[in-house]
Amino acid sequence: MNAINHATTALIINKKWPGVPIVFVLISVQLVEILWVVLNLFGIEITTTEPQVRALNDIHLAYMPYSHSIAATVVFALVVWVVFARFLSKPVWGLALAVAVSSHIVLDLATHVHDIALAPGIESPKFGSGLYGVPLLAFVVEMIYGVWCWWIFRGSKALLAVIVLLNLGALSFYSPLIPGPEHLLAGHPSIFAAAIGVHIIVGLLAVGLLARSQWQSSADRPKAAGN
Protein backbone atom coordinates (compact mmCIF):
# COMPACT_ATOMS: atom_id res chain seq x y z
CA MET A 1 0.00 0.00 0.00
CA ASN A 2 1.13 3.51 -0.80
CA ALA A 3 3.02 4.98 2.16
CA ILE A 4 0.66 7.93 2.58
CA ASN A 5 -2.28 5.58 3.05
CA HIS A 6 -0.47 3.55 5.70
CA ALA A 7 0.30 6.85 7.41
CA THR A 8 -3.37 7.84 7.44
CA THR A 9 -4.07 4.84 9.66
CA ALA A 10 -2.57 6.95 12.45
CA LEU A 11 -5.62 9.21 12.13
CA ILE A 12 -7.91 6.31 13.03
CA ILE A 13 -5.70 5.22 15.92
CA ASN A 14 -5.68 8.75 17.32
CA LYS A 15 -9.46 8.97 17.02
CA LYS A 16 -9.88 5.72 18.97
CA TRP A 17 -7.07 6.20 21.50
CA PRO A 18 -6.46 9.96 21.81
CA GLY A 19 -4.09 9.72 24.77
CA VAL A 20 -1.28 7.99 22.89
CA PRO A 21 1.60 10.25 21.72
CA ILE A 22 1.12 10.67 18.00
CA VAL A 23 4.81 10.27 17.21
CA PHE A 24 4.65 6.73 18.59
CA VAL A 25 1.52 6.04 16.55
CA LEU A 26 3.04 7.35 13.32
CA ILE A 27 6.17 5.23 13.75
CA SER A 28 4.11 2.16 14.67
CA VAL A 29 1.91 2.20 11.57
CA GLN A 30 5.06 2.14 9.41
CA LEU A 31 7.33 0.04 11.64
CA VAL A 32 7.03 -2.99 9.36
CA GLU A 33 7.88 -0.95 6.26
CA ILE A 34 10.77 0.84 7.93
CA LEU A 35 12.23 -2.55 8.80
CA TRP A 36 11.65 -3.70 5.20
CA VAL A 37 13.62 -0.73 3.85
CA VAL A 38 16.55 -1.38 6.19
CA LEU A 39 16.66 -5.12 5.50
CA ASN A 40 16.51 -4.56 1.73
CA LEU A 41 19.27 -1.97 1.78
CA PHE A 42 21.46 -4.44 3.68
CA GLY A 43 20.54 -7.32 1.35
CA ILE A 44 18.92 -9.40 4.08
CA GLU A 45 15.54 -9.30 2.36
CA ILE A 46 15.29 -9.46 -1.41
CA THR A 47 13.34 -7.51 -4.01
CA THR A 48 13.65 -8.27 -7.71
CA THR A 49 12.47 -6.51 -10.86
CA GLU A 50 11.58 -7.42 -14.40
CA PRO A 51 14.08 -6.28 -17.08
CA GLN A 52 11.64 -3.46 -17.80
CA VAL A 53 9.58 -1.85 -15.04
CA ARG A 54 6.39 -0.16 -16.17
CA ALA A 55 4.13 -0.69 -13.14
CA LEU A 56 4.15 -2.13 -9.64
CA ASN A 57 3.51 -5.69 -10.82
CA ASP A 58 6.94 -5.62 -12.51
CA ILE A 59 8.54 -5.43 -9.05
CA HIS A 60 8.55 -8.56 -6.93
CA LEU A 61 8.92 -8.67 -3.15
CA ALA A 62 10.66 -12.00 -3.41
CA TYR A 63 11.89 -12.53 0.14
CA MET A 64 10.71 -10.54 3.16
CA PRO A 65 9.93 -13.02 5.96
CA TYR A 66 11.44 -10.91 8.74
CA SER A 67 9.60 -7.67 8.05
CA HIS A 68 6.39 -8.78 6.37
CA SER A 69 5.48 -12.26 7.54
CA ILE A 70 2.32 -12.68 9.58
CA ALA A 71 4.12 -14.27 12.51
CA ALA A 72 6.82 -11.58 12.57
CA THR A 73 4.18 -8.87 12.76
CA VAL A 74 2.47 -10.65 15.63
CA VAL A 75 5.81 -10.74 17.44
CA PHE A 76 6.45 -7.03 16.76
CA ALA A 77 3.00 -6.12 18.05
CA LEU A 78 3.42 -8.30 21.13
CA VAL A 79 6.80 -6.78 21.94
CA VAL A 80 5.37 -3.27 21.60
CA TRP A 81 2.47 -4.20 23.88
CA VAL A 82 4.76 -5.74 26.50
CA VAL A 83 7.09 -2.73 26.52
CA PHE A 84 4.33 -0.17 26.96
CA ALA A 85 1.70 -2.12 28.88
CA ARG A 86 3.96 -4.09 31.23
CA PHE A 87 7.25 -2.25 31.57
CA LEU A 88 5.94 1.31 31.25
CA SER A 89 2.53 0.65 32.85
CA LYS A 90 0.68 2.16 29.89
CA PRO A 91 -1.81 -0.56 28.87
CA VAL A 92 -3.88 1.75 26.67
CA TRP A 93 -0.77 2.90 24.84
CA GLY A 94 0.36 -0.71 24.48
CA LEU A 95 -2.95 -1.78 22.96
CA ALA A 96 -3.16 1.18 20.59
CA LEU A 97 0.41 0.80 19.35
CA ALA A 98 0.07 -2.97 18.95
CA VAL A 99 -2.99 -2.37 16.77
CA ALA A 100 -1.06 0.28 14.82
CA VAL A 101 1.81 -2.13 14.15
CA SER A 102 -0.60 -4.91 13.13
CA SER A 103 -2.54 -2.62 10.81
CA HIS A 104 0.34 -2.57 8.36
CA ILE A 105 0.31 -6.27 7.57
CA VAL A 106 -3.50 -6.34 7.50
CA LEU A 107 -3.54 -3.62 4.84
CA ASP A 108 -0.77 -5.32 2.88
CA LEU A 109 -2.65 -8.63 2.97
CA ALA A 110 -5.63 -6.75 1.55
CA THR A 111 -3.64 -5.40 -1.41
CA HIS A 112 -0.54 -7.50 -2.16
CA VAL A 113 -0.20 -10.42 -4.51
CA HIS A 114 0.79 -13.68 -2.83
CA ASP A 115 4.11 -12.52 -1.35
CA ILE A 116 3.47 -12.46 2.41
CA ALA A 117 4.80 -15.52 4.22
CA LEU A 118 3.26 -17.06 7.30
CA ALA A 119 6.56 -16.97 9.21
CA PRO A 120 10.34 -16.89 8.64
CA GLY A 121 11.42 -20.31 7.42
CA ILE A 122 7.99 -21.12 5.97
CA GLU A 123 8.14 -20.14 2.31
CA SER A 124 4.84 -21.66 1.23
CA PRO A 125 2.01 -20.88 1.12
CA LYS A 126 2.21 -17.12 0.75
CA PHE A 127 -0.70 -14.81 1.26
CA GLY A 128 -2.24 -11.71 -0.30
CA SER A 129 -5.55 -10.75 -1.88
CA GLY A 130 -4.02 -10.43 -5.34
CA LEU A 131 -5.36 -6.89 -5.72
CA TYR A 132 -2.01 -5.67 -7.03
CA GLY A 133 -2.59 -7.97 -9.99
CA VAL A 134 -5.08 -5.29 -11.08
CA PRO A 135 -3.01 -2.17 -10.31
CA LEU A 136 -5.53 0.52 -11.25
CA LEU A 137 -8.19 -1.08 -9.07
CA ALA A 138 -5.64 -1.22 -6.26
CA PHE A 139 -4.97 2.48 -6.77
CA VAL A 140 -8.66 3.32 -6.38
CA VAL A 141 -9.06 1.12 -3.30
CA GLU A 142 -5.98 2.61 -1.65
CA MET A 143 -7.06 6.19 -2.27
CA ILE A 144 -10.54 5.44 -0.93
CA TYR A 145 -8.95 4.04 2.23
CA GLY A 146 -6.75 7.11 2.73
CA VAL A 147 -9.69 9.48 2.23
CA TRP A 148 -11.86 7.36 4.54
CA CYS A 149 -9.26 7.68 7.31
CA TRP A 150 -9.25 11.45 6.77
CA TRP A 151 -13.06 11.55 6.89
CA ILE A 152 -13.24 9.57 10.14
CA PHE A 153 -10.65 11.90 11.66
CA ARG A 154 -12.41 14.98 10.24
CA GLY A 155 -9.10 16.34 9.03
CA SER A 156 -8.38 19.66 7.35
CA LYS A 157 -8.85 20.34 3.65
CA ALA A 158 -5.09 20.77 3.37
CA LEU A 159 -4.55 17.26 4.71
CA LEU A 160 -7.12 15.85 2.29
CA ALA A 161 -5.43 17.63 -0.60
CA VAL A 162 -2.04 16.18 0.32
CA ILE A 163 -3.47 12.66 0.68
CA VAL A 164 -5.04 12.91 -2.77
CA LEU A 165 -1.99 14.52 -4.38
CA LEU A 166 0.46 11.97 -2.96
CA ASN A 167 -1.77 9.19 -4.26
CA LEU A 168 -2.02 10.82 -7.68
CA GLY A 169 1.74 11.32 -7.68
CA ALA A 170 2.12 7.55 -7.64
CA LEU A 171 -0.46 6.91 -10.37
CA SER A 172 2.10 6.04 -13.06
CA PHE A 173 3.30 3.24 -10.80
CA TYR A 174 -0.18 1.69 -11.05
CA SER A 175 -0.54 1.88 -14.82
CA PRO A 176 1.90 0.86 -17.57
CA LEU A 177 0.10 3.31 -19.86
CA ILE A 178 1.15 6.36 -17.84
CA PRO A 179 4.82 7.30 -18.21
CA GLY A 180 6.79 7.84 -15.04
CA PRO A 181 10.14 7.22 -13.37
CA GLU A 182 9.45 3.51 -12.84
CA HIS A 183 11.79 2.48 -15.65
CA LEU A 184 14.72 3.74 -13.57
CA LEU A 185 14.06 0.97 -11.04
CA ALA A 186 14.72 -1.91 -13.45
CA GLY A 187 17.60 -3.94 -12.07
CA HIS A 188 18.01 -1.56 -9.13
CA PRO A 189 15.97 -2.88 -6.19
CA SER A 190 18.06 -0.92 -3.70
CA ILE A 191 16.92 2.31 -5.38
CA PHE A 192 13.35 1.10 -5.02
CA ALA A 193 13.90 0.43 -1.31
CA ALA A 194 15.44 3.87 -0.83
CA ALA A 195 12.53 5.48 -2.69
CA ILE A 196 10.08 3.70 -0.42
CA GLY A 197 12.05 5.04 2.54
CA VAL A 198 11.62 8.57 1.22
CA HIS A 199 7.90 7.96 0.67
CA ILE A 200 7.57 6.76 4.26
CA ILE A 201 9.18 9.92 5.61
CA VAL A 202 7.10 12.20 3.37
CA GLY A 203 3.87 10.42 4.28
CA LEU A 204 4.50 10.49 8.02
CA LEU A 205 5.55 14.14 7.95
CA ALA A 206 2.52 15.10 5.87
CA VAL A 207 0.07 13.44 8.22
CA GLY A 208 1.91 14.47 11.36
CA LEU A 209 2.29 18.13 10.46
CA LEU A 210 -0.97 18.80 8.63
CA ALA A 211 -3.07 17.18 11.35
CA ARG A 212 -1.06 18.49 14.31
CA SER A 213 -3.63 21.11 15.32
CA GLN A 214 -6.30 18.41 15.51
CA TRP A 215 -4.44 15.59 17.25
CA GLN A 216 -6.50 14.58 20.23
CA SER A 217 -4.70 14.17 23.54
CA SER A 218 -5.77 12.59 26.80
CA ALA A 219 -6.88 16.05 27.92
CA ASP A 220 -9.65 15.98 25.30
CA ARG A 221 -11.42 13.06 26.96
CA PRO A 222 -11.93 11.73 30.46
CA LYS A 223 -8.69 10.04 31.41
CA ALA A 224 -8.75 6.28 30.75
CA ALA A 225 -7.51 3.85 33.36
CA GLY A 226 -3.83 3.09 32.89
CA ASN A 227 -3.33 5.96 30.48
What are the language-model segments listed below?
Residues 1-227:
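N-terminal membrane-targeting hydrophobic helices
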